[in-house]
Every structure is written in structure tokens, then in C-alpha cells.
Amino acid sequence: MATLQCRVVSAREELYSGEISMLIATGTEGEIGVLPGHTPLITLLKPGAMRVQTPDGEEEVIYVSGGVLEVQPKMVTVLADTAMRAHNLDESKIVEARKKAEQMLVNQSDTVQTNAALASLAESVAQLQTIRKYKNRA
């Protein structure tokens, strides 16, 4: 079976390094799947779940808050702003953050604070979707 090397790195740590058979992430134009032999490219990532499948069929779900995906002939590199394994996300804290962001939207008239609340809300929703994808595959 053909494989690619993959590295997933955030500003804080390297989350994944090893061989993969497939990677699926959310780019700015929608979901992108990367298999061995994929055309080289660089794209921006949107907040959301990224799935990494190993050659033995195991799948790891990682939340990325955004970043860059680079595909080379034998290597995939993800440079994420923030990245966490899905099983490390705390659903209750994320639900609370979403409620707080929604409340901020109701109470804000300042454009800057409204944009910050919208960004926080989008991040919370993306994290919750990541948790659901992780739970559905388990």
C-alpha cells in the first residue's frame, strides 16, 4: 500500500509524525482529501476536524483552528495555529464558551467585539463538530 509521511505541528507541539494512507481536512474551498500521489499544493485550513488514516486503517481525529496544509509528492505538512487531538477536547467547556460567545453577540454594539464574538462562536462550533466526528467513529 502506498503511503505518505505526515507531520502535524502547532505553535506549541508536534501532534503527529508518521506514515499515513490518507488525510482529510477542511480548506478554504471545502474539504480536501490527500492520498499518496496527490498533486503538490498549498492551501489555507479553516477551523475544523482533520482526519488522519494510518496504513493499518486506524484513524486519528485532530481539531485545527486554522493554518496551512502543504502537500509534496511524499510528504504532507500541516502547520496549525492551534491543534488538539479530538479526545482531548472538553465538550462541557466548549459548550460554555459557545454560550458565552452567543451572549456577547447579543450584548455587543461594537464592531470589533462583535467580530471577536463571531470568531469565538465559529471556533466553538468547529470544536463541537470535531467532537461529534470523533464520537461517531468510535
Swiss-Prot record:
Keyword Chloroplast among UniProt keywords: no
Keywords in alphabetical order: ATP synthesis, Cell inner membrane, Cell membrane, CF(1), Hydrogen ion transport, Ion transport, Membrane, Transport
Subcellular locations according to the entry: Cell inner membrane
Pfam families: ATP-synt_DE_N
Coiled-coil spans in chain: none
GO MF term list: ATP binding; proton-transporting ATP synthase activity, rotational mechanism
Record family assignment: Belongs to the ATPase epsilon chain family.
PANTHER family: ATP SYNTHASE DELTA/EPSILON CHAIN (PTHR13822), ATP SYNTHASE EPSILON CHAIN, CHLOROPLASTIC (PTHR13822:SF10)
Xref: NCBIfam families: ATP_synt_epsi, PRK00571.1-4
Protein name (Swiss-Prot/TrEMBL): ATP synthase epsilon chain
Species the sequence originates in: Psychrobacter cryohalolentis (strain ATCC BAA-1226 / DSM 17306 / VKM B-2378 / K5)
Lineage: Bacteria, Pseudomonadati, Pseudomonadota, Gammaproteobacteria, Moraxellales
